[in-house]
């Protein structure tokens, strides 16, 4: 029995354990209790029957007196789910007795368990390890692993007044996204799949529901997986067959089905003229993570390189390297960076470690960077080091320059795009630009510019079976594409 990367996971709260938790947190209302009881019955599975959602996460053991009752109550649900082809993952939150809980899960027919750590034990059932986002043990991550303490995608509540977005420090509305962490996971745990665990905000209602489709798209566009989680009001309304709730659920399933039909995109490689290099661990984790997050907010296209592994021999299209760590590069890293600069590249660092004969010059006094000319390229060194992640992101964006953008979005400050490419398969040369709208309102009159001359592109959107051809308009030195009204997401695929 192995972990299945084709699983589409969803939280399935039910049973005595969830009831006890809600009672302790004073979140138990009559409609919530009714919902928890209904979701614990086999008939509750009608919600996911016939949908792409094929893996349910259930509480299995927490070390309390309700564990035995929980496991007994789940038996009919597990049996009915197996007949529908649904897999179950049991969440085990124990410090002691983990082995017995896992053995009980195996006997009950669960497909896997989710644990915070294995304490060096081996089990006869696949394990999904779950970590706090800032404490992921990358080298020990399971084939599928999970992180918690993630953010709900969309406009930050601190930048909202009613339905109006207020500018953040960037001068733009403050957009929350897990994109940077998904990309980081792909680099630090290659060949593995991360499940992001986060719940909808408490403010979500049927009249103003959280954007579930955006939450899912924000993960899948960057090759991670969201553990789908519904708010209590929506769960209760679905039990009553409320038409509004059914519409929200259908949109969720529509988005899931769309991404399931484009699994090949997950193998596409991130594109960008900037490489962000760090070991992304220990004392370097906070700065590097914040810089990635802020670069993404500024719509900078970048690649991530883990310096704990060998630096890549080939970096086609790369124009700049941001060396984030305080430590000077090792001799092989030094040779790599120096060769890159000598070929005309830009290296950005917080301390100078280049050739001693190079003399600094001020390229731009407002940036507070010293510029060292090295053959055809330069090393840019921050005068005060990298003290503020926000300033590092701003300065990097200015040093790399907009003229090196691979793609730009016009007429909407609450959208973002991700550029990737297929360089391995027979479709070698295909480029993909995925566009996400983080506003609760449709984005209108948005133009996507790409840095290549492209006659046309295939436009993909959830809810449509086939792509439609979108004609490009020459916008030297690239091409403009005028996008249709964008509710949540679209993707443009083209050769170039």
Regions found by a protein language model. Give the residues of each.
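Glycan-processing catalytic domains of CAZymes
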Residues: 1-323, 331-345, 349-360, 365-388, ...
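Carbohydrate-binding surface patches
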Residues: 272-297, 336, 416-453
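Short acidic/proline- and small/hydrophobic-mixed sequence motifs that coincide with surface turns
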Residues: 342, 442-444, 467
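C-terminal beta-strand-rich structural cap/linker in extracellular carbohydrate-active enzymes
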Residues: 348, 475-496
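A generic structural signal for beta-strand entry/edge sites
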Residues: 377-378, 428-432, 443, 476-480, ...
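Extracellular/luminal ectodomains and secreted, surface-exposed scaffolds of diverse proteins
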Residues: 466-476
């Amino acid at each position: 029995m192995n972990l299945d990367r084709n699983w589409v996971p969803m939280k399935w709260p039910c049973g005595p354990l969830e009831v006890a938790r809600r009672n302790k947190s004073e979140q138990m209302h009559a409609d919530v209790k009714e919902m928890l009881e209904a979701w614990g019955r086999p008939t509750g599975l009608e919600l996911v029957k016939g949908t792409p959602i094929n893996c349910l996460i259930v509480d299995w053991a927490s070390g309390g007196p309700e564990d035995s009752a929980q496991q007994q109550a789940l038996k009919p649900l597990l049996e009915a789910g197996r007949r529908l082809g649904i897999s179950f993952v049991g969440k085990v939150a124990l410090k002691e007795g983990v082995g017995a809980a896992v053995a009980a899960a195996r006997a009950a027919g669960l497909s896997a368990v989710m644990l915070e750590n294995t304490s060096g034990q081996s089990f006869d059932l696949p394990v999904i390890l779950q970590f706090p986002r800032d404490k992921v043990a990358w080298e020990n991550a399971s084939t599928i692993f999970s992180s918690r303490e993630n953010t709900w995608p969309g406009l930050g509540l601190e930048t909202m007044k009613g339905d109006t977005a207020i500018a953040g420090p960037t001068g733009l509305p403050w957009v929350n996204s897990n994109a940077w962490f998904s990309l980081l996971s792909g680099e630090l745990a290659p060949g593995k799949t991360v499940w992001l665990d986060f719940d909808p905000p408490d403010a979500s209602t049927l009249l103003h529901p959280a954007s579930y489709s955006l939450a899912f798209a924000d993960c899948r566009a960057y090759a991670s997986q969201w553990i789908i989680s519904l708010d209590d009001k929506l769960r209760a309304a679905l039990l009553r067959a409320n038409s509004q709730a059914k519409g929200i659920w259908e949109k969720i399933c529509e988005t899931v089905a769309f991404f399931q039909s484009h699994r090949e995109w997950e193998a596409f490689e991130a594109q960008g003229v900037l490489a962000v290099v760090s070991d992304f661990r220990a004392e370097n984790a906070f700065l590097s993570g914040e810089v990635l997050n802020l670069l993404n907010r500024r719509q900078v296209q970048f690649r991530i390189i883990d310096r704990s592994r060998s630096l890549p021999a080939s970096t086609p299209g790369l124009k700049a390297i941001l060396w984030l760590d305080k430590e000077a590069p090792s001799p092989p890293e030094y040779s790599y960076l120096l060769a890159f600069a000598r070929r005309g590249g830009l290296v950005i660092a917080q301390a100078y470690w280049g050739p001693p004969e190079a003399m600094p010059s001020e390229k731009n006094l407002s940036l507070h960077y010293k510029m060292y000319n090295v053959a055809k390229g330069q090393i840019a060194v921050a005068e005060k080091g990298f003290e503020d992640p926000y300033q590092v992101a701003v300065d990097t964006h200015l040093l790399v320059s907009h003229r090196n953008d691979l793609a730009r979005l016009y007429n909407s400050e609450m959208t973002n795009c991700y550029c990737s490419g297929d360089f391995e398969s027979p479709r070698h040369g295909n480029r993909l630009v995925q566009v996400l709208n983080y506003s609760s309102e449709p984005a209108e009159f948005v133009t996507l510019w790409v840095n290549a001359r492209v006659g046309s592109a295939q436009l993909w959107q959830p809810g449509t079976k086939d792509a439609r051809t979108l004609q490009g308009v020459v916008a030297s030195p690239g091409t403009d594409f005028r996008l249709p009204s964008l509710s949540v997401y679209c993707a443009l695929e083209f050769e170039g």
